[in-house]
Amino acid sequence: MPPAELPSTVTIKVNDCIIVGKAQPASEAYPKPLDLFYGLRYGKAGRSKAPVSEPLKSASGGIDATKPKPPCPIPMAPQETSEDCLRLNIVRPSKSGNGPMPVVVYLHGGGFNFGNPLDADMAAFVARSEKDIMSVSVGYRLGALGFGPGEEGDDARSNLGLRDQRVAVNWLREWIGWFGGNGEDITLMGVSAGAHSVSPPG
């Protein structure tokens, strides 16, 4: 029996940090070849704690971003979840030579209790765009972990999921340029709770 074919990969070096993503060839479903980077950690947070940005840094053996990471916990989750879920997924056209690309950030819906950043096929969104763009889907804490009750005036524990989203956008402003994106040209989009997240000013 022949050995299983290894997936094609793409590598980015950010200072001393090596990031290995998945290279996806063009197909009928995805007209452009794409590079996908799954599960990049943008922040860390203890339970009931505000998030802190996590810079890209070297790890033993580099960062394997070829496969999705477990999403944030939700009730009756159909798959493995993890509280280490302040992660984002990047999709870009392969070998774009048109300079820094606009970045579209997708925030998933689910009433702030359910959902997954990979619910929407953002790879198809990028592959079928007339102009070269990048997409980023963001994981943020949900339910009691992200929107649990706090004492009146307890700002430290309120709306932690929304704080996660803000940390993710600030992370992108700093780091997306290494992936070919324009940190000064970021558009937020979402559905349901994700659209609600986009609406507040600031």
Where do the model's predicted regions map?
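Short alpha-helical patches at coil-to-helix transitions and adjacent helical residues
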Residues: 85, 162-169, 195
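Extracytoplasmic/periplasmic beta-strand context in beta-sandwich domains
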Residues: 123, 184-186, 199
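Gly/Ala-rich beta-loop-alpha elbow adjacent to hydrolase catalytic centers
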Residues: 190, 194
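Gly/Ser-rich "nucleophile elbow"/oxyanion-hole loop immediately N-terminal to the catalytic nucleophile
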Residues: 95-100, 150-160, 167-188
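Non-catalytic accessory segments of hydrolases
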Residues: 1-156, 162
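Amphipathic alpha-helical interaction motifs in eukaryotic regulatory proteins
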Residues: 108, 126, 166-173, 177, ...
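Short glycine-enriched nucleophile-adjacent loop
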Residues: 195-202
